[in-house]
Amino acid sequence: MTPSNPTRLGSTALLNPAFSLKMMVWALVFLSLIQCSTQKGDDDYEDYTSNKTWVLTPKVHESDVTLILNGLLEGYDNKLRPDIGVKPTVIHTDMYVNSIGPVNAINMEYTIDIFFAQTWYDRRLKFNSTIKVLRLNSNMVGKIWIPDTFFRNSKKADAHWITTPNRMLRIWNDGRVLYTLRLTIDAECQLQLHNFPMDAHSCPLEFSSYGYPREEIIYQWKRSSVEVGDTRSWRLYQFSFTGLRNTTEVVKTTSGDYVVMSVYFNLSRRMGYFTIQTYIPCTLIVVLSWVSFWINKDAVPARTSLGITTVLTMTTLSTIARKSLPKVSYVTAMDLFVSVCFIFVFSALVEYGTLHYFVSNRKPSKDKDKKKKNPLLRMFSFKAPTIDIRPRSATIQMNNATHLQERDEEYGYECLDGKDCASFFCCFEDCRTGAWRHGRIHIRIAKMDSYARIFFPTAFCLFNLVYWVSYLYL
């Protein structure tokens, strides 16, 4: 038997019409499979540009998300917290401070704008899908359980609703839930104004659960510190932001022990406004009151009007300074400064009143009256220890001693037991009516203005030195 040629057999098979048709069918089937595979790949992946790099990511179908949400909410009771009766729900909190201010010292409150975030695990919201996280808006908030967090020292709080409610909800496939919202809060801050306006304060923002005690809900900080925005845009005006700190504590009440989270914002007051409005004007008024010491003591209208004007001005300044403060019962640093300035101004007016009283109410000398009545006494007046007042000068004889004094330093107090009381004012009431006693303290009337020119500025400078060192450095 002659063996067949393989090449001839292959050629014969190719020429067979049935075999050719069979090969064409297989080729069409193969091409169809390739086309279907390509279309399926295009449907399951979509292209997006990120930094000019093409990446293929899975498409999320709207129907898939709807099915997941419907499955999660089926039989879900939003009135019950996660793990109820098993273990406490741990709430991880975080805060971003958008702005602080203004601070209202009269009402003792401040305004703060924050983004508040809470994260917890709810096993009832676990789902199996290629979608790792569901990014939802505020419409889903009312359908799941949300912590009943409230701000304990809040006087007023507003949630932002423009253009839509500023709330966000995220649900991960492992049951983790993130809930954030934006709030503007008017919080209470008890200001201690003893050192006003050189005071510093630590204003708290406290929050906790309203109805769940520590056995039900535990709050924890997600990060060790709270993040803040650009402080240059904050409307603090009279204050400077110096830092913050966050704490966790347990507060015991009649309804249970609650975990309270607190953020303390440290603020220090700027003195520029009060220096211009109060301190400098008060200092200038005090200095202005010293001008009367250089005015002639006989210029009664000038010195009196100057003293009264400065006193009234100080009263007005003290009233204006108090308008920016609450009606506290204790004395502030500014009250002390204004009060001392008022005392200095009032003392300057009292000094002139004292001087004018003893100058204008001088008594004529008895020896002088006798000389006017008896011409013989005037002729032999050099033999007796009397006072002889002349138009330009006066000769005072004390114990056979002669002293020449100017006319403007003479006053008509009579001498006691031969002593010269005419040029002195005794600090004791019985000086002009009683006997002379050795060791009395005397103040020279004519030199009161001279003494005041030195005493008042020196005392005021010493007060300022002690005042500023005590409040700024101690």
Curated annotation (Swiss-Prot):
Matching PROSITE patterns: NEUROTR_ION_CHANNEL
Residues carrying covalently attached carbohydrate according to the record: N51, N128, N246, N266
MF-aspect GO terms: chloride channel activity; GABA-A receptor activity; GABA-gated chloride ion channel activity; transmitter-gated monoatomic ion channel activity involved in regulation of postsynaptic membrane potential
GO biological processes: adult behavior; cellular response to histamine; chloride transmembrane transport; gamma-aminobutyric acid signaling pathway; inhibitory synapse assembly; post-embryonic development; synaptic transmission, GABAergic
Gene Ontology cellular component terms for the protein in this record: axon; chloride channel complex; dendrite membrane; GABA-A receptor complex; GABA-ergic synapse; plasma membrane; postsynapse; postsynaptic specialization membrane
Disulfide bonds: C189-C203
Positions on the Cytoplasmic side per record topology: 296-301, 359-450
Major localization listed first in the record, in broad terms: membrane
Signal peptide limits: 1-38
Spans traversing the lipid bilayer: 275-295, 302-321, 334-358, 451-471
Subunit structure: Heteropentamer, formed by a combination of alpha (GABRA1-6), beta (GABRB1-3), gamma (GABRG1-3), delta (GABRD), epsilon (GABRE), rho (GABRR1-3), pi (GABRP) and theta (GABRQ) chains, each subunit exhibiting distinct physiological and pharmacological properties.
Function recorded in the entry: Gamma subunit of the heteropentameric ligand-gated chloride channel gated by gamma-aminobutyric acid (GABA), a major inhibitory neurotransmitter in the brain. GABA-gated chloride channels, also named GABA(A) receptors (GABAAR), consist of five subunits arranged around a central pore and contain GABA active binding site(s) located at the alpha and beta subunit interface(s). When activated by GABA, GABAARs selectively allow the flow of chloride anions across the cell membrane down their electrochemical gradient.
Protein name per the record: Gamma-aminobutyric acid receptor subunit gamma-2
Organism annotation: Gallus gallus (Chicken)
